Amino acid sequence: MPETNPSLPSWLNRGMADLFPAGEPSDVDQSLAARLAAAEAEGRPLRVKLGIDPTGSNIHLGHSILFRKLRAFQDAGHIAVLIIGDFTARIGDPTGKSATRVQLSKNDVAVNASTYLRQLGQDQPKETALLDFETPGRLEVRYNSEWLEGMDLPAVIGLLGTGTVGQMLAKEDFSNRYNSGTPIALHEFLYPLLQGYDSVAVNADVELGGTDQKFNVAMGRDLQRHFGRGTQFGLLLPILVGLDGAQKMSKTLGNTVGLEDDPLSMYSKLEKVGDTAINDYVTLLTDLNVEALPENPREKQKAMALAVTATRHGTDAAAKAQLDAGNLVGGAGDASADVPEASLLAVNFPAKAFYLMSAVGICASSSEARRQIKGGAARLDGEKITDPNQEFASAAELDGRVLQLGKKTFRRLTA
């Protein structure tokens, strides 16, 4: 992560990967510190935009980094403008994609959006919610169909006229696909312009995004200038590495920790995070200082897992999860080293639970595995497996987790 900006408050600096522009310190269009100072002098909060396309139904910890920063702005007295991309989700963000996304129906997007808001804490007290839905004036939830769905053809053509094909092909994802001969649909070029126009529609002062979103965030600033509006700052945060320690956290890769994972499952997964990722997890997912972590690598893992789980579920639930994880393998403290390992190398993924149990040798056959699961004897990291057909996407999703049969049989799965 880059060096902190001494002119900005510590809560804003924390975890920041990039801030642009970062020009003349006294210019409110070039310096976020100057914009903050001017807003305070005028007695007005900044409008901080975060756009999300509800293309799935679950939020994981990798997504939560941006929501945590948005909440920090709320707690500092600013307005969080959460844009639900119910229109743009029907196109699909081409960022990071090697092929055109499958377009979603309007109904699919609406269902996903409702699920997202629930997970963000729409029905929770602000003390436990990821975003503050309670404090008046701190949150606007906007749907970009408000301003995009009614655009007529002249308006769309005018928007297209603000960008060039050269600009779009300079975007790495488009460039790679073009150079490899992979088709790029024309509507995909429209996506960055539509997302950028969201910033015009809501008069954003700041837009949050991952480091992979810099092109789209910069497009918003360009369009604000084109339409004669005040221009936003782009504040980018790192992409969280997944449980495999190699690639970004992604449901497709099976290396995620879900926001709705129960405390024991969340703690048990986090306890296996590799040494190189621990500091980033602490910085991006908690308010704990990295310097406060134990030096011992194993104790450091456990401290991180406890802190992250507590951030989501509270300190009592996290402490119980840590205790339960220690007792999971039949002894007090950390007995995890005594659990026999079972390799996943011979397992064909995606793998259903009944097949997995027979493939790693914890059950003699698939039929026995089905019986054991239906009888309530099978657990993964202490959480009961209830469906024999529960599917696991990859070895990375299971690496380091403990598969249990009954009270005495355990296997630590290794990729």
Swiss-Prot record:
Principal location listed in the UniProt entry: cytoplasm
GO MF, one example: tyrosine-tRNA ligase activity
Name of the protein: Tyrosine--tRNA ligase
Domain S4 RNA-binding: 351-415
GO CC entries: cytosol
Natural source organism: Synechococcus sp. (strain CC9902)
InterPro entries named among the record's database cross-references: aa-tRNA-synth_Ic (IPR002305), Rossmann-like_a/b/a_fold (IPR014729), S4_RNA-bd_sf (IPR036986), SYY-like_C (IPR054608), Tyr-tRNA-ligase (IPR002307), Tyr-tRNA-ligase_bac-type (IPR024088), Tyr-tRNA-ligase_bac_2 (IPR024108)
PROSITE patterns, per the entry: S4
Catalysed reactions, as listed in the record: tRNA(Tyr) + L-tyrosine + ATP = L-tyrosyl-tRNA(Tyr) + AMP + diphosphate + H(+)
